[in-house]
Regions:
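Transmembrane alpha-helix segments characteristic
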Residues: 16-23, 76-79, 241-244, 389-409
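Transmembrane-helix motifs of polytopic, lipid-linked glycan transferases
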Residues: 57, 162-182, 376-381
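Membrane-interfacial entry segments at the cytosolic side of transmembrane helices
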Residues: 63-70, 234-240, 272-289, 439-451
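Transmembrane-helix signature of polytopic, membrane-embedded enzymes
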Residues: 158, 175-197, 395
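Membrane-interface helix-loop-helix junctions at transmembrane boundaries of multi-pass membrane enzymes
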Residues: 176, 181, 232-237, 358, ...
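Hydrophobic, aromatic-rich transmembrane alpha-helices
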Residues: 53-54, 344-391
Length: 471
């Protein structure tokens, strides 16, 4: 078992990134990515692939307490720096502290600012009473959280972002503990470091939207549920924490809650834990959970799932036809059935500048590239888990990740970075396991994957430029 991030893999990743960037920039020279985002991407890629190998070795000798202290300190420092810099950057280019195209962010802020001056009775009636939205509760969680922050601190925009930096840093510790329990202490530390240095997790701390809090709840749900399933003794707090966490996911995005319940049921069904081998107990747990789903999910849950499912036709068909009409015939082949098999590698990195609305994707291109490159280790992890007959131990993370990403990839949002982001906590765990199980035979395949990654980035650049009729 490899217990550190190998330097030679990091060097390959960096070289592959610059080869991809140079090829895309030269071929689509007129639409080359803005220089500021090239610099930002270079910083993020260097930070991730230089410091992860170094710290995975240096921090392996630390006590758990010191490791957690170092991990949180690094994570929160990086995130706070980004929060401050992005705040003033957005003020400079937009005149307000919101990113380009921040309709959702401004909506959340405006609603929370307005409701923060109202009574709690009015607030709960607004969200849960007769006047509540017909779309259900799937977008209630973040507005409630944000207006609570505003009630305490006032409608100061930077305060929630500072809290996001702390929440995201805490998530790094959760990912470490989950991975350490599932695999090995030193392997778990690699997962924590990668989480701390993951560019998109840093960038989202500067956004006024729900993704950071949502990812924290996803990671906490997986960690607490894994603890529950592996523990031989149960107490009310352990059980209630898992239930409350999966319940909270329904308040952020119904599909997340469904994926969480599905993952729990799958884990119980295939668990090798001695305490879960009592057939009657297993049937009782599954039966009770199914009953809860039927009772609680008869309305809004199925409505949102159906909406995502229906969009796999209406959304993606409309997008493909529009793009094809503008000269990119490849768009006709970007169906859900094509995108779904690539779900562990999505989204592709945007290394071209086609319009000002896309600058957010340019800013996040480094994080998307890391997902493209590290997908190799997710595939290796799945292969090794099956080969070694250890897949039952990892059903919780795997079932959640693929249940969620599967629905998204078939719904017309197959390359939407924001919609794919909730799969990242599970993928971080899978990357770590695949990396730890790398063998000489599988390592040889990495050079072919690097070529494939270059083709991914070039192909996506062609798709972005062609879909807008720019050549």
């Amino acid at each position: 078992m490899i217990q550190f991030f190998p330097q030679q893999i990091a060097r390959r990743a960096i070289v592959t990134y610059f080869v991809s960037l140079i090829i895309v920039s030269c071929v689509f020279f007129s639409y080359a990515m803005l220089f500021e985002y090239v610099v930002l991407g270079t910083i993020f890629i260097s930070l991730f692939f230089v410091m992860t190998p170094r710290w995975s070795v240096d921090w392996s000798i630390l006590t758990e307490k010191n490791y957690v202290r170092y991990l949180f300190s690094i994570a929160v420092t990086l995130r706070l720096i980004w929060v401050v810099l992005s705040y003033f950057h957005y003020m400079n280019i937009n005149g307000d502290p919101f990113e380009v195209g921040a309709a959702d962010a401004k909506g959340y802020h405006g609603e929370a600012e307005w409701l923060s001056s109202e009574s709690w009775a009015y607030i709960f009636n607004y969200y849960f009473g007769a006047a509540a939205s017909t779309t259900g509760f799937s977008d209630v969680g973040y507005p409630l959280y944000l207006l609570t922050v505003y009630k305490i601190f006032g409608p100061i925009i930077i305060i929630p972002r500072i809290l996001k930096a702390c929440i995201s840093s805490w998530m790094c510790i959760i990912i470490y503990r989950l991975s350490a329990r599932m695999f090995d202490e030193k392997v778990g530390r690699i997962a924590g470091i990668m989480c701390a240095l993951m560019p998109n997790l840093i960038i989202y701390c500067g956004y006024h939207i729900k993704e950071t809090e949502m990812l924290f709840l996803i990671a906490a749900f997986m960690e607490r549920t894994d603890y529950l399933l592996r523990n031989h003794k149960y107490n009310i707090w352990t059980i209630m924490s898992a239930i409350l966490l999966v319940g909270s996911l329904f308040l952020f995005r119904t599909v997340l809650g469904v994926a969480g319940v599905f993952a729990f049921l799958t884990s119980v069904l295939f668990s090798n834990t001695p305490s879960m081998k009592r057939g009657l107990k297993r049937v009782a747990i599954i039966g009770w959970s199914l009953l809860c789903i039927i009772v609680a999910g008869g309305g809004a849950l199925m409505t949102e799932i159906e909406e995502y499912w229906n969009k796999k036709d209406t959304n993606s068909d409309a997008k493909r036809m529009e793009q094809a009409s503008k000269g990119n015939q490849w768009a006709l082949y970007a169906t859900g059935s094509v995108m779904a098999p690539m779900v562990v590698a999505l989204p592709f990195a945007t290394m071209v500048h086609v319009d000002d609305i896309q600058v957010g994707q340019e800013a996040k291109h480094a994080g998307n590239y890391i997902r493209n490159f590290m997908a190799f280790f997710a595939l290796i992890g799945m292969y090794e888990a099956i080969r070694q007959k250890k897949w039952r131990d990892f059903t919780l993370v795997g079932a959640y990740t693929f249940a969620y990403l599967g629905v998204i990839s078939l719904s017309g949002f197959g390359n939407s970075e924001r919609f794919l982001l909730p799969g990242l906590p599970g993928l971080l765990v899978m990357w770590t396991y695949g990396l730890s199980q790398l063998r000489e035979q599988t390592y040889r395949l990495l050079k072919y994957w690097c070529v494939l990654v270059v083709l991914m980035e070039f192909g996506w650049g062609f798709f972005k430029v062609g879909s807008r009729g720019l050549f």
